[in-house]
Every structure is written in C-alpha cells, then in structure tokens.
Amino acid sequence: MSSFDEDIKRSIWEGKIPIVFTLSPDDLTSHLSPSPYTLMAPRNSYFPLITSLVKDYFSSSTLVLLDEMWLEYRGIPLKWHLPIGVLYDTIVGNNNCNNSNNNNNNNNNNNNNNNNNNNNNNNNNNNNNNNNNNNNNNNNNNNNNNNIIMEQPYWNIVVHFQSYPDRILLRCPNIESVRTYYKNVLKEANFIKQGDITKINNLNINQSNDLWDGLKSHDYDKFWSVNKKLIPNSNKEYKNIPIRLIINYKPPIQELIPVFDENLVELTLENLFSRIPYESFSNFLNYNNNNNNNNINNNSPPLSPNSNNNNNNNNVDNSIENSLNQTNVESAEPEFSNLLQYIKATNAEYKIQGIQPSLKSSAVWLYEHFGHPDNFLYIVLIDPSQNNNNNNNNSNNY
C-alpha cells in the first residue's frame, strides 16, 4: 500500500463529529440544569465506547442507571450498534443539506437586495469586506483550523437515564455487549467477503484483544495491525464486497456485490449502484413527507436494530411500514430499475464516511479505505423527498 493510500485510511479513521450532550429534563433530580457536555466523537466508534465521560459528568444531576442510559436526537432513539458517523449521516445529513441550501438561498436573496442599493452603499460594503478579508488573512493557521471546525454544526443529543425504549433499541447493559455484537457483525462481513470466517478464527487471543482494544481506544495502529489480516491479499480473493445501504434509518439493505463484472473489469461505485434493484429499497422511500414528521413527533419507533436486512423486520416494524404504505400510496410513482437510475433521476445524494465519492471510484478501493471497523462499507442515501419535507416544515434547527 502506498503512503498516499495509508494517509487516506488514517484521515478517514481520524474523522470526528462535534457533539453537545444535554441531560433530559425528565432526568433532573435538582432544580439546576447542568451545562451541556461537549465531545469530539470519532466517526468510526460506537456511542457506548465514548459515553463513560458523559455518564460521569451528569452523575451529580441525576440518578445514573448505567444499563438505562440511552441517547435521542429530535425524538429519535439512537441505535448504539451503528457507527457514530453512519448515524450522523443518516439522521442529520438531511438537515445539513437543507441548511446549505437555505444558506445559499439567503445569500442569493441578500445579494439581490444589495444590488438594489445605490452604488455608494455597494462601494462602502466592498471596502469593508476587503478590509475584513485582509484582517482575516493575517490570522494564524490555528484560527483557520477553528473556522473549518465551526463550519460543521454541533450535533445536539439528549441523554436519558430512565425509560429505556427496549421496544426500539437493543439493550446494552455493558461494554461486553458491544464487543459481542461487534464480533458477530465482523464475522458476517468476513463471510460475505471470503465465503468463510477462517481468518477471524485464526486470530489468537492477543490479536483479538488488540483488534477490540484498538477500536475501543480509537488507536489506529493497534486496530489496523490486526484488521489488515482480514483484508484479502488481492482483489481476486474477494467473493463479494460487504456493503450496507442505509435509507431513512431503516434496517440495512445488503446485496452481494462482486469485485469484478462478467468481463473481469473492476466494478466502480456506479456499477455497484446499478446492481442494487429498485424494489429492494423502494418501500423505504415511503417514509417521507408529513408521515415522517408525524411518526417522529408521536415517538413511533424506527425499525428494529435486530434486523440485518430489509427482509427481517419484526412485528413492530411491519405495523409501522404497513401504516406508512397505506398513507403514502402514490398514483404515479416513477419507475426505476436500480439505485443508479434513482440517484441520477432525483439527484439524490449519498454519503460514505460523510463525503460523496465520485461514481467512477473503484468499489473495492472504497471498501478498503472507507470501510468501517465492522468490515462493512456503509452507504447512506439521502432521500430527496425527506429533504423537501424538512424544508417545508422549517425543521432545520438542531
């Protein structure tokens, strides 16, 4: 692996999200609310691995029940078993897109208004802007870095220590529960990747511990010293690329995606999308418009974290999906054959580790560099209908 590729992997690993944790008013045991707790959370980690400090911080303001702690964002319980970055892209990604669009629209409106002002005002504004720019250019690199960080809004999360929503979320009584879940998903990904789990079974106890400790402590070198052993030596050793497509906080969609096509040409991201049939995710797009907001406001549970794909919904999930389908029947729903056609026709955005790679990117290269610690490549689809709904309801403040 080249030093360039190594730098990319390390940069992806070091990606972080600024989070503000606020204690739920229902959990207060005193009249004084504690100040929020801020944290830079690694995208590739899991909430139970980083929230021990949050528990300690709020312990003086509430009765902390360790096995009852859960997190919520705008009425949505956060699934602890998904990587933090995947949760952020799935739930907050729509709002980020909307805020950018709104800011652009506001800027355009302001520009139009400014154009109607007289020339003297315009000249004064330009001079002031130039002076400000000159002053800004004299700032040091630290200030520039701070400006970059501040461009990303904080993720405001509410912390609860009672009334655990176990109809929605898996129980997580301790860190060992996270390790067990992680190990099971890791085995699943490697079975998809190579047709067996021999490489995982061949890890000795020290290597298994280093893999877990590297993830838990967010230690890139320790984690990758073991995880690299789970990567095939060549592209020809792959059976399939382990991917998970996430749409509207529904259970992951998993399709068997080979590295090469029938002509032994490496698949690109564009080819990958063309191999995901529209019918495998079309029902998930019904979770939109007012029905989406109504379900969130009524605290209706999202799909169960026990589900590994769209065919394994539990009874709660089925009842929700049936009610959504009944109220979201479209008389003239457009027909698409696959995900690629849907993306191009609707200009839908997709996120992998928080960015949108080119459709011409090699699928296996993305997997090896943008993959997550559980050895899956998570692709988050931003549903355009969800964006429009949020715009119409002005629900962009978070």
Curated annotation (Swiss-Prot):
Cross-link (Glycyl lysine isopeptide (Lys-Gly) (interchain with G-Cter in ATG12)): 187
GO CC annotations, alphabetized: Atg12-Atg5-Atg16 complex; autophagosome; cytoplasm; phagophore; phagophore assembly site membrane
Membrane topology reported for the UniProt record: Peripheral membrane protein
PTM statement from Swiss-Prot or TrEMBL: Conjugated to atg12; which is essential for autophagy.
Pfam families: ATG5_HBR, ATG5_UblA, ATG5_UblB
Region (Disordered), start-end ranges: 99-147, 292-321
Keyword set, alphabetical order: Autophagy, Cytoplasm, Isopeptide bond, Membrane, Protein transport, Transport, Ubl conjugation
One GO-annotated biological process of the protein: proteasome-mediated ubiquitin-dependent protein catabolic process
Disulfide bonds: none
Cell location: Cytoplasm; Preautophagosomal structure membrane
Function: Involved in autophagic vesicle formation. Conjugation with atg12, through a ubiquitin-like conjugating system involving atg7 as an E1-like activating enzyme and atg10 as an E2-like conjugating enzyme, is essential for its function. The atg12-atg5 conjugate acts as an E3-like enzyme which is required for lipidation of atg8 and its association to the vesicle membranes.
PANTHER family: AUTOPHAGY PROTEIN 5 (PTHR13040:SF2)
Similarity annotation: Belongs to the ATG5 family.
Name the record gives this protein: Autophagy protein 5
Organism in which the protein naturally occurs: Dictyostelium discoideum
Phylogenetic placement of the source organism: Eukaryota, Amoebozoa, Evosea, Eumycetozoa, Dictyostelia
Gene it is expressed from: atg5
